[in-house]
Amino acid sequence: MIFTQPSFVPALPSPLPLGETIGDFCMSERLAKVGNDAVEEQPIPFIDAAIDKSWTTDEINTRVAQLTRALATEWNIAPGEKWHKQVAVLASNCVSIFMDTLILTWAIHRLGGGCLMLQPTSSVEEMAAHIDHVPPFAMFVTLDLVTLGQETIQKSSQSADLPFYKFSKVYGPPAKNAPDTSNVKSLDALLEKSKDQAPIEKLLLAEGEGSKRVAYYCTTSGTGGFQRIVAITHENIIASILQAGLFTGITKEKSEIALVFTPFNHIYGLLTAHTLMWLGHSTVIHRGFNMLEVLMSIPKRRITTLYLVPPIINAMSRNASLLDRFDLSSVSSVIAGGGPLNKEDYAKMQTVRPNWKLLSGWGQTESCAVGSLAYPKDTVAGSSGVVLPGVRLRMRNDDGNLVQGLEEMGEIEMSSPSVLYEYIDNATEALITPHTEEYWRPTGDVGLIRECPSGIQHLFIVDRIRDMIKVKGHQVAPGEIEVHLMKHDAVGETAVVGIADAVAGERPLAFVIREPSYSPETSDAELRKILQDHNDSALPEIYRLQNRIIIVESIPKSANGKILKRELRKQVVGWTPPKE
């Protein structure tokens, strides 16, 4: 059975508008939506919260044009030449570097190139492998990451003469023991060198070109295994922008002011920035999630929508008294991405902020970020929303058969013009060969479709296949144990992974962060026993933790707040329970 969008959701246009690169596509549509308004009434596309810097559409257009000319001059790209090279971008998660990064990528797209978005939270070894799989023509780094970028090149098989550039500015206090970067060419130097050159015309894409020309190479999150690289074409991301944008357009009565902190080297941040630009909304950028900074920013900017991840939503719900100290009346909705928001966490946040609409979604890097979003007029706790325009879903059960109805659980397979075809192990140029036949991508997520009381069908995510724990031949979803543990007042945060067991094959093991306000006189050993009783007395035998509970100070997370279960699995290799 194939599940598609509800009837009230607008259809995806056919054919897709693929005549421009994605940056120009978003800017053209934005101007069509708000360009006729008085300048002072036009929503500001991007606002840099830390330094109070606004980027208008004109400023962005001018900067993109200047950088396009500068890069063409530096690399001897002739006017009208379609370039196919790949450029690596290693940018820190700090303030206006967000916009510098985005503008740089749009300039590279105008030349025909693709951008390899490296994550600074990756190891040198991981990044070296990435630039070996996608050999870049050049690399751009932020000032604080010059040494990391140089070490990455040295660790890789790439030439030490690889053109290496730095972003011109650093925001915030200078780093201690900062390296000397005076011999590294800057963006400002490129701009100065090319200022008298003729402008470069915008790149127009021929029919079929958008489906094979790569815009971004992104790494998968690596939360459950090794990082992999996927190629995102202009068609992929334009389809995803339209899917999210058309759906959001029917749910928003006025322009929104959104708060975003997810970095642009991650697909969630990339898609959010592009979609909000396309919609004509304003985006307030923070360097990361600092609770006090965000709470102060909301009344100052009159933020209407928060783009968050579930761990941060949980952190806010645990700090209700802190939230009460600020005027948060402008906020109407919270978009939860980067992972499913379970019904218990949903309920906690609704108790703290009953007037906020909590809107969860589902997607992944391989689906170019999004496949479903919550419908504000029919929100359901634990739901990941409804299927978006142009998306088709089907589920395959453990026997390998397609499910034939509602409430049947299976691995989700997705078909959509936004879906990426394969992982990239060897890319010599920013072009791929698109599939010509119908393509269904297995997602690795286990889910089901449920018809809710409204009659609207919703997607519910059960767990990741690779995170499922096989106990005595039965599949155990870690999320079910995590949800139950979070019901206890002692648990601030938790993550459950599988550990080898000689008899059962695997057994669940829980990492737990103690809630600071809970009974400080209770020892870790006593707390483990309390949580064991709480869990094992309520759940079936295959879900029991027994003495497999580890109390920790922190749980490793990716830059966008996802729990890194692969790191947790490494920590419990050869683990034995404490003797108590």
Curated annotation (Swiss-Prot):
Task of the protein: AMP-dependent ligase; part of the gene cluster that mediates the biosynthesis of verlamelin, a lipopeptide that exhibits antifungal activity against plant pathogenic fungi. Verlamelin is a cyclic hexadepsipeptide and is bridged by ester bonding between a 5-hydroxytetradecanoic acid moiety and a carboxyl group on the terminal Val of amide-bonded tetradecanoyl-hexapeptide D-allo-Thr-D-Ala-L-Pro-L-Gln-D-Tyr-L-Val. VlmA and vlmB are altogether regarded as essential components in the biosynthesis of 5-hydroxytetradecanoic acid.
GO MF annotation list: ATP binding; CoA-ligase activity
Family stated for the protein in its record: Belongs to the ATP-dependent AMP-binding enzyme family.
Taxonomic placement: Eukaryota, Fungi, Dikarya, Ascomycota, Pezizomycotina
Effect of deleting the gene: Leads to complete loss of verlamelin production.
Methyltransferase found in the keyword field: no
Top-tier EC class: ligase
Keyword terms, alphabetized: ATP-binding, Ligase, Nucleotide-binding, Virulence
Residues annotated for ATP binding in this entry: G338, R464, K562
Protein EC: 6.3.2.-
A matching Pfam family: AMP-binding_C
CDD domains assigned: Firefly_Luc_like
Name of protein: AMP-dependent ligase vlmC
Source organism, top-level taxon: Eukaryota
Pathway involvement of the protein, from the record: Secondary metabolite biosynthesis
Binding site for substrate: F264, N265, K562
